[in-house]
UniProtKB/Swiss-Prot annotation:
It comes from Mycobacteroides abscessus (strain ATCC 19977 / DSM 44196 / CCUG 20993 / CIP 104536 / JCM 13569 / NCTC 13031 / TMC 1543 / L948) (Mycobacterium abscessus). This is Phosphomethylpyrimidine synthase. The keyword Iron applies. HAMAP family: ThiC. Its cofactor is [4Fe-4S] cluster. The gene is thiC. Zn(2+) binds at residues 344, 408.
Length: 546
């Protein structure tokens, strides 16, 4: 895997070991596949099995060799067409069986959603290291984490560690957006060691080959770059084929113009040559290439709004209409398709985006960057965007592209990646709860029960981030006895509402108060006792001071 230019940057170690309070388990399938899960063992003898994206990196029995890469999964078929074509033919593939167990749904539901184009399974034949997953509104909301170097900073080793770190905390997919040196080598290291699907934006590498000159781009150069990446195993590719020459002037009066890197590159090419982009004119040829590998289209929103002021404008929706036309063409070639969405959108305009995407794009899975619900919080855009992400996911978006605290400010580091993933896991899980996903509330119920019963270790271990939950608790109550105390430092021992409620329940149990009738009877007896006491004192309201 190493080349002379990349050996010095090659990763030697990454984060491994189980997440606190958990162990890696597998559900064995008849076809030889093993579906991963994370089991949280509770102190009351119970356990909860969770959807797991961390790959073998949290398996204590796994041997990790970054130079060899991960072992390929069994049962990969490369000669029967794409997952879409096979689903339309009525076939439940090995990947669909795997996903059905992972999601806790019937395999036929997986097949029908893929056949209808409402879900995609990004699984390039050349990426056998990945564990099959699905993106579609009938399933759990997924999150994508962007990593990748820039011309200014980062190394191959750092990007591989970011990938492992992101999936440890719940990233379902990774996009390698490298724009600096060693793009091919960085992607190779990530792919060979990634148990989740990997996406790219091929135009970035193509532009690097022209030394950064958009006007020098050609269809042949781009086509060769796509084939190069598909051969490596890239599972889905962002293609900004909807940026048409006539749409570029629509952005002239925007506050922030064109903010998509890919969109701006293609807009510059269109203006330089004064014709439609080669991505649009050669789209059918591109479909044929992607179909050979079963690479999924992620049709890019090159004209997405980059500010609240530009949300839902003419340029954005004009491009979306074109993406709808391209979706039909891609499906006719048997290529799986998802649609990328904004961006920066105020809360009251968010749902309109989902409705219009589903109408124009035949309900292809929607994949959105946030959206940010306000522009005023640099350094906190993982929060501003998670607000919009939760709303748009509840409305039907299938996958959320995370935003880190460094958005608009710089290249995210390891801590930023974790903060972004956790913020988006909150948004995705909140949407799953609202949509009634069959497994979503089990975790909430388990944690709430642990909280009420003061099982602190279980509270930590059931949380999205056990390490930080424990750290925050121990800042003020670090002693080991505090892990069984019936209070925390917020309320102290006298004012804890849950302890008081527990005392009330104990009192009720001791006095046989199980129903409302029992309570009413107790109150009546109490009133009778007080009435008798009042009579004993002469029925006087005021008594002399003793």
């Amino acid at each position: 895997m190493s080349t002379p230019s990349s050996r010095s940057q090659a990763p030697e170690t990454v984060t491994t070991g189980p997440i606190q309070g958990s162990e890696k388990i597998y559900q064995e399938l008849p076809n030889g596949l093993r579906v991963p899960q994370r089991r949280v063992n509770l102190t009351n003898g119970e356990y909860l099995d969770l959807y797991d994206t961390s790959g073998p990196y949290t398996d204590t029995n796994a041997v990790i060799d970054l130079h060899k890469g991960l072992p390929p999964r069994a049962g990969i078929v490369t000669d029967r067409g794409t997952q879409l074509q096979r689903a339309r033919a009525g076939e439940i593939t090995a990947e669909m069986e795997f996903i059905a167990v992972r999601e806790g749904v019937p395999a036929e539901l997986v097949r029908t959603e893929v056949a209808a184009g409402r879900a995609v399974i990004p699984a390039n034949h050349k990426h056998p290291e990945s564990e099959p997953m699905i993106i579609g509104k009938a399933f759990g909301v997924k999150i994508n984490a962007n990593i990748g170097n820039s011309a200014v900073t980062s190394s191959i080793a750092e990007e591989v560690e970011k990938m492992v770190w992101a999936i440890r905390w719940g990233a379902d997919n990774i996009m390698d957006l490298s724009t600096g040196k060693d793009i091919h080598q960085t992607r190779e290291w990530i792919l060979r060691n990634s148990p989740v699907p990997v996406g790219t934006v091929p135009i970035y590498q193509a532009l690097e080959k022209t030394n950064g000159d958009p006007a020098a781009l050609t269809w042949e150069l781009y086509r060769d770059t796509v084939i190069e990446q598909a051969e490596q195993g890239v599972d889905y590719m962002t293609v900004h084929a909807g940026v048409l020459l006539r749409y570029v002037p629509l952005t002239a009066k925007r506050v922030t113009g064109i903010v998509s890197r890919g969109g701006s590159i293609m807009a510059a090419w269109c203006l330089a040559h004064h014709r439609e982009s080669f991505l649009y004119t050669h789209f059918e040829e591109l479909c044929e290439i992607l179909a050979r590998y079963d690479v999924t289209f992620s049709l890019g929103d090159g004209l997405r709004p980059g500010s609240i002021a530009d949300a839902n404008d003419e340029a954005q929706f004009a491009e979306l209409r074109t993406l709808g036309e391209l979706t039909k063409i891609a499906k006719s070639h048997g290529v799986q398709v998802m649609i990328e969405g904004p961006g920066h959108v105020p809360m009251h305009k968010i749902v309109e985006n989902v409705k219009l995407e589903e109408e124009l794009c035949e309900e292809a899975p929607f994949y959105t960057l946030g959206p940010l619900a306000t522009d005023i919080a640099p350094a906190y855009d993982h929060i501003t965007s998670a607000i919009g992400a939760a709303i748009i996911a509840q409305a039907g978006t299938a996958m959320l592209c995370y935003v880190t605290p460094k958005e608009h400010l710089g290249l995210p580091d390891r801590k930023d990646v974790k903060d972004g993933v956790i913020a988006y896991k909150i948004a995705a899980h909140s949407a799953d709860l609202a949509k009634g996903h069959p497994r979503a509330q089990l975790r909430d119920n388990a944690l709430s029960k642990a909280r009420f019963e003061f099982r602190w270790e279980d509270q930590f271990n059931l949380s999205l981030d056990p390490d930080t939950a424990r750290e925050f608790h121990d800042e003020t109550l670090p002693a080991e006895p505090a892990k069984t105390a019936h209070f925390c430092s917020m309320c102290g021992p006298k004012f804890c509402s849950m302890r008081i409620t527990a005392d009330i329940r104990e009192f009720a149990a001791e006095n046989g108060l199980e129903t409302q009738e029992d309570i009413d009877a107790m109150l009546a007896r109490g009133m009778e006792e007080k009435s008798a006491e009042f009579a004993e004192h002469g029925n006087r309201v005021y008594l002399p001071i003793a």
